[in-house]
Amino acid sequence: MDPPTAGAQSLGAAEQPRGLQLPSGREAPPSPGTAFAPADHSSQEKATENATDRLANGAQSIPHDSPAHGEGTHCEEEGFAEDDEDSDGEPSPWELSEGMSGCLPKEQAGDLFHEDWDLELKADQGNPYDADDIQGCLSQEVRPWVCCAPQGDMIYDPSWHHPPPLIPHYSKMVFETGQFDDAED
């Protein structure tokens, strides 16, 4: 079942969905008294063959007003109706009617929040944390290495600017006497 039909049936819509309708098994069979006239599709088949030939020869697309599409069928094939109104003649709920286009809702100034900085400063007077405390916290959050930097004379140590090596390097190893005595046994 195609998505428009499934959506219409799931929502219980009374209106039939637009677009190319495929026969389903639940439709009522034609009445026995109905006579079928043979339809002449030879002109449509020739136009379709011509359009296919043009596409095979390198055409990027075929315009909708070409004879390859039947009259008035190109919109139904794509799933769009030619007019913007439903089959009952009423505009869709997401569209504005022609008379309502100038009556758009306007933003009201009363909806905006008004800041009173003086009132906020008075409220913050009893706050034990002042702006310096807040700035100090922010600088440590942004630059966490600041708290680890030495405060005295700056001596260059390359280990501050490089990640630690995967294999530890010991420049000076000191062994205690008797440290490896049990390893020899």
Curated annotation (Swiss-Prot):
One of its GO terms (biological process) is chromatin remodeling. GO terms for cellular component: nucleus. Residues 78-89 have a biased composition (Acidic residues). InterPro entries: COPR5. The keyword Nucleus applies. Histone-binding protein required for histone H4 methyltransferase activity of PRMT5. Specifically required for histone H4 'Arg-3' methylation mediated by PRMT5, but not histone H3 'Arg-8' methylation, suggesting that it modulates the substrate specificity of PRMT5. Specifically interacts with the N-terminus of histone H4 but not with histone H3, suggesting that it acts by promoting the association between histone H4 and PRMT5. Involved in CCNE1 promoter repression. Interacts with PRMT5. Interacts with histone H4; specifically interacts with the N-terminus of histone H4 but not with histone H3. Interacts with CBFB. Found in a complex with PRMT5, RUNX1 and CBFB. This is Coordinator of PRMT5 and differentiation stimulator. It comes from Bos taurus (Bovine). The gene is COPRS.
